[in-house]
């Protein structure tokens, strides 16, 4: 079921991107309703639309039939948030989010893998943590930028979904305070843009908490395009870190993101656990 949903999401994304004639800075789509192509829990789908509707980065929406699927197109602008996000010295990547549907799929996979807590590192507007929350995770959203955390607070209040936004430097935060048992960490940074340094720091912190790594998963956002990565493309550019820190790859899924909207390849997300 999940594999076909992912393929259908990629199909409508590519069809939409090929025919999009608008001028919005960012744009993404969410199916209007559950269907055979998108067998999503109706309550969850309603919450995904609520996230977009209550999120100030989106200024317009309209319905469109894409590859035979009724969808809502959301158009937005993240320029101000992007500019604000790059002012922090330890920030590993400017705010450039994955798609809401992609965030849901990733959280769904993590749930199937047995994790109960979701920690979104460099969380932007909190969409992965939000999706974790509606799927029953205890979510924590770690973001260094105060403006983005303010945006998350607004979304929490408007959607009645508290995914625990925290304005803090992920490199300095004491994760033992969260009393994690079976967490999955999502690393918000590509390897060639400082994400490798962020990930290495988070792994060190996981290792510093007694017995935590036994039940911990880490998800990395990778790339399939040589122009973005001059080194090893295997595992989305994360192979060296995966080998160095003795991680096993347990799943890889490629999904639409804001930054691959104009590309024929999607963003690979690599699910790993400690050996």
Predicted regions and their residues:
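Conserved class I S-adenosyl-L-methionine
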Residues: 114-124
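Conserved SAM-binding motif I beta-strand of class I
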Residues: 138-143
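C-terminal substrate-binding/active-site "lid" region of AdoMet-derived donor-dependent transferases
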Residues: 197-264
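Short alpha-helix immediately C-terminal to the canonical SAM-binding loop
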Residues: 149-150
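S-adenosyl-L-methionine
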Residues: 2-113, 153-179
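Conserved SAM-binding loop of SAM-dependent methyltransferases across substrates and taxa
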Residues: 127-137
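A short SAM/SAH-binding and catalytic strip from SAM-dependent methyltransferases
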Residues: 182-198
């Amino acid at each position: 079921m999940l594999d076909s949903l992912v393929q259908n999401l990629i199909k409508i994304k590519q069809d939409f991107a090929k025919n999009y004639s608008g001028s919005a800075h960012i744009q993404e789509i969410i199916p209007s309703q559950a269907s055979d192509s998108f067998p999503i829990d109706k309550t969850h789908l309603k919450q995904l639309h609520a996230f977009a509707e209550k999120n100030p980065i989106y200024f317009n929406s309209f319905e469109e039939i894409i590859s035979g699927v009724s969808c809502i197109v959301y158009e937005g602008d993240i320029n101000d948030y992007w500019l604000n996000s790059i002012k922090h010295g330890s920030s590993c990547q400017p705010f450039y989010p994955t798609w809401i549907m992609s965030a849901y799929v990733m959280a769904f996979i993590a749930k199937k893998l047995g994790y109960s807590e979701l920690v979104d590192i460099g969380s932007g507007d909190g969409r992965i943590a939000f999706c974790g929350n509606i799927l029953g995770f205890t979510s924590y959203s770690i973001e260094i930028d105060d403006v983005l955390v303010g945006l998350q607070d607004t979304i929490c209040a408007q959607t009645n979904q508290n995914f625990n936004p925290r304005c803090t430097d992920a490199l300095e935060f004491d994760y033992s305070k969260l009393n994690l048992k079976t967490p999955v960490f999502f690393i918000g940074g590509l390897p060639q843009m400082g994400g490798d340094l962020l990930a290495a720091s988070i792994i060190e912190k996981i290792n510093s908490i007694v017995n935590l790594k036994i039940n911990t998963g880490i998800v990395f956002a990778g790339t399939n395009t040589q122009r973005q990565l001059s080194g090893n493309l295997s595992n989305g550019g994360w192979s060296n870190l995966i080998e160095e820190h003795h991680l096993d790859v347990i799943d890889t899924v490629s999904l639409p993101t804001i930054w691959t909207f104009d590309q024929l390849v999607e963003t690979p997300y690599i699910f790993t656990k400690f050996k």
